[in-house]
């Protein structure tokens, strides 16, 4: 309604300027004109606030503890829970990768019906020794909430800027990517109890710790702390894997 009234006033004023319309001062809605000043002022304030939310362009790699999924007791396919353990630890929750492995939801690699497990429901297959695939954001988010409650946010489906914003706030981010942090061409189609999904055995999970204009830094549960990887390739791989991300606020 305010927008409509604003347009009407602008049309009237335009008529005054271009067609010489005569308007008596008593016919002008002075309070409304004053309200227009407030709208403009509020708009300027909002713009200033939004500009403060813009990315700085970099975030120095955080000192997040590194856990190796291959350390005993080994989790051959346990990159997701190992990365979650790093993020939880940074937020102040003392938990091991193997504890999380025992707590995360699981589903079979292959059902008796021939259907495949859905990583959106739980870890698919055998995490410790294989064969297995992995687990996606939803079960990880649910598991993280049992520790950190409302401090956990699922950023899945948002733009990469949402991840970088969290890094600038000092929060490492759990993500799904690929093993070499570049898009892959070996995607497979699986029929699951929930329908058809696209998967790859090249799926991998890491804890993102920082970024700049060229690189993304991450704790790789294969044993690399603040590993530097090409930002453009990483973003493409992350998007290919469904833009999955979970963060725990400090």
Curated annotation (Swiss-Prot):
Keywords in alphabetical order: Signal
Cysteines paired by S-S bonds: none
Source taxon at top rank: Bacteria
InterPro entries membership: Peptidase_C39-like (IPR039564), Peptidase_C39_single_dom (IPR039563), UCP032442 (IPR016997)
Record bears the keyword Signal: yes
Residues in the signal sequence: 1-25
A Pfam family that the UniProt record links to this protein: Peptidase_C39_2
Gene3D superfamilies in the record: Cysteine proteinases
Keyword Nucleotidyltransferase: no
Name of the protein this chain belongs to: Uncharacterized protein YvpB
Source organism (scientific name): Bacillus subtilis (strain 168)
């Amino acid at each position: 309604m305010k927008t409509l009234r604003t347009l009407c006033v602008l049309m009237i004023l335009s008529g005054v300027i271009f067609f010489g319309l005569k308007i008596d001062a008593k016919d002008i809605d002075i309070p409304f004109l004053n309200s227009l000043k407030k709208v403009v002022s509020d708009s300027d304030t909002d713009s200033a606030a939004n500009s403060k939310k813009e990315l700085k362009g970099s975030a120095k790699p955080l000192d997040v503890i590194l856990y190796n999924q291959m350390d005993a007791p080994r989790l051959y396919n346990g990159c997701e829970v190992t990365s979650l353990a790093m993020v939880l630890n940074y937020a102040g929750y003392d938990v091991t990768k193997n504890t999380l492995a025992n707590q995360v939801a699981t589903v079979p690699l292959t059902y008796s019906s021939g259907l495949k497990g859905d990583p959106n429901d739980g870890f698919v297959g055998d995490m410790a020794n294989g064969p297995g695939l992995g687990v996606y954001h939803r079960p990880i988010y649910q598991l993280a909430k049992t520790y950190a409650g409302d401090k956990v946010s699922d950023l899945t489906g948002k733009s990469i800027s949402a991840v970088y914003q969290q890094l600038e706030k000092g929060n490492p981010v759990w993500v799904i990517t690929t093993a070499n942090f570049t898009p892959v061409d070996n995607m497979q189609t699986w029929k699951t109890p929930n329908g058809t999904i696209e998967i790859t055995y090249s799926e991998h999970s890491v804890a993102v710790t920082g970024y700049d204009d060229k690189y993304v830094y991450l704790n790789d549960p294969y044993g690399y702390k603040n590993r530097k990887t090409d930002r453009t390739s990483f973003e493409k791989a992350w998007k290919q894997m469904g833009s999955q991300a979970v963060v725990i606020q400090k």
